[in-house]
A protein has these predicted regions:
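The feature captures the LRR N-terminal capping module
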Residues: 1-58, 67-81, 85-115, 172, ...
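ATP-binding glycine-rich loop module of kinase domains
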Residues: 229-266
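Protein kinase glycine-rich loop
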Residues: 219-225, 230
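Conserved short submotifs of the Hanks-type protein kinase catalytic core
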Residues: 288-302
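C-lobe/activation-segment region of protein kinase-like
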Residues: 368, 372-418
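Short beta-strand micro-motifs within the conserved protein kinase catalytic domain, predominantly
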Residues: 278-291
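Activation segment signature within eukaryotic-like protein kinase domains
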Residues: 333-334
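Catalytic-loop of the protein kinase fold
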Residues: 341, 345-361
Length: 419
């Protein structure tokens, strides 16, 4: 019996009184266990992901302490309206269901974080604008053709994912009200009908080596992200030579940021820069037809500047508590990543996920910017909108500079680098 099935058995036996967290993932549930209501006064986090649920009970608001609910990878076709009446609920995750309808009353004004990635949502209700405290909104991989006009009222919104939807026009995906939001800092919109042709042109126009799969020998798995696996490898070109590289093989599935094909187009278009993790070539002839890239192997002396946001921090990276920088180190990291961002903008790209956890640094404070999963091509024929998008990226740079300043022994060292 798995740990979660043991938890379910204990729940049904009444042995979890006072529990605050309940993990019932992959328990084969097709109905909401009514015994959960026995924890109504204490339960703050409930995870029902990976089951066969289609509905939640109408009396869900009886869970008066519930703040976080995950129901990803179930069979929901409608976002349950009862969510909107839960008195403390502020984080809702329903990724990878079959949700086509979001009722107006399903969105609580208390929402801080809403995840609806990889569903079938064609429209969001105007009540979205009442979510004045909403900071993070994940809508990639749906069927949206427009955003509600009220999106401009989401004054706390910092991160939004709109990639891989059905937006035919850029003004429907990126309305002026959205781009004018004062705190919007991380934005992704690749893989929509209005920009897929631009992505294809970029792939076709960018000169890049085609590296045969049989020239590569995979080594150890270095890491796994939402879009793929990264391996160490040896590259032995047919003309001779042997050198270490990294190989990224894309999974080919929807991620929280968008489609792997969009990420690959952005990686290639990013070209070469001293502070950007570069691409050596595109893999050809993979036996299963997988798409992949060959990249330079990053020396082990490089490490992530920070960890990704937590459930509590929402949109802010989590740094090691003891991490400190000299003024020179902080300045070098900020200057290098600023230059990397300016390079991407010059290449016609918005990074969209400019975060410390996507930056590698070594002991000499040399920084490398990576992870193009949320990158999008700038609309070169729409200068005002393009400039607005660059400003959003630069707002993320300001956040990074603030975070470095907080951990720097000479905070004034970074003043000149602020956008």
């Amino acid at each position: 019996m798995t740990a979660n099935l043991t938890t379910l058995a204990n729940l049904r036996a009444g042995r979890l009184a006072g529990a605050t967290h309940l993990d019932l993932r992959h328990c084969g549930l097709d109905e909401f266990p009514r015994e959960i209501f026995e924890l109504a006064d204490t339960l703050t986090m409930l995870d029902l992901s990976g089951n066969r649920l289609r509905t939640l009970p109408d009396d869900l608001p009886r869970l008066r302490a519930l703040r976080t609910l995950f129901c990803s990878s179930n069979l929901f076709e409608t976002l349950p309206a009862a969510l909107g009446a839960c008195p403390e609920l502020d984080l809702v995750g329903f990724k990878a269901n079959a949700i086509a309808h979001v009722p107006a009353d399903a969105l609580s004004p208390r929402l801080r974080w809403l995840i609806l990635s990889d569903n079938r949502v064609a429209a969001m209700p105007e009540t979205l604008g009442a979510c004045r405290g909403l900071r993070k909104l994940a809508l990639a991989g749906n069927r949206l053709t427009a955003l509600p006009a009220s999106i401009g009222d989401c004054e706390s919104l910092e991160l939004i994912r709109l990639s891989a939807n059905a937006f035919e026009r850029i003004e429907d995906a990126l309305p002026d009200g959205l781009l004018a939001l004062p705190r919007l800092t991380w934005l992704a919109y690749a893989g929509n009908p209005f920009n897929v042709a631009q992505e294809a042109r970029a792939l076709a126009a960018t000169p890049i080596a085609r590296i045969a799969w049989d020239e590569l020998q995979l080594g150890e798995l270095l890491g796994e992200g939402a879009s793929g696996h990264i391996w160490s490898a040896r590259w032995r070109p047919a003309q001779g030579g042997d050198r270490p590289v990294a190989v990224k093989l894309f999974k080919g599935a929807m991620t929280s940021d968008g489609l792997p094909g969009s990420e690959m187009a952005a990686c290639i278009a990013a070209d070469v820069h001293a502070h950007v993790i570069g691409v050596e070539g595109r893999i050809a002839g993979h036996p299963q037809g997988a798409q992949g890239l060959v990249m330079g192997l990053i020396p082990p002396r490089y490490r992530s500047l920070a960890g990704p946001p937590s459930l509590a921090s929402c949109t802010r990276d989590v740094y090691a508590s003891e991490l400190r920088f000299t003024g020179a180190q902080a300045h070098a990291i900020a200057r290098g990543t600023r230059d990397a961002l300016a390079h991407l903008h010059a290449q016609g790209l918005m990074h969209g996920d400019f975060y410390a956890h996507n930056i590698l640094v070594d002991d000499d404070a040399h920084a490398l910017l990576g992870d193009f999963g949320a990158a999008s091509f700038l609309p070169v024929d729409d200068v005002p909108r393009s400039e607005a998008l660059k400003r959003i990226d630069r707002r993320a740079l300001s956040v990074l500079i603030d975070e470095l300043t907080q951990r720097c022994d000479t905070p004034d060292a970074l003043a000149e680098l602020r956008p």
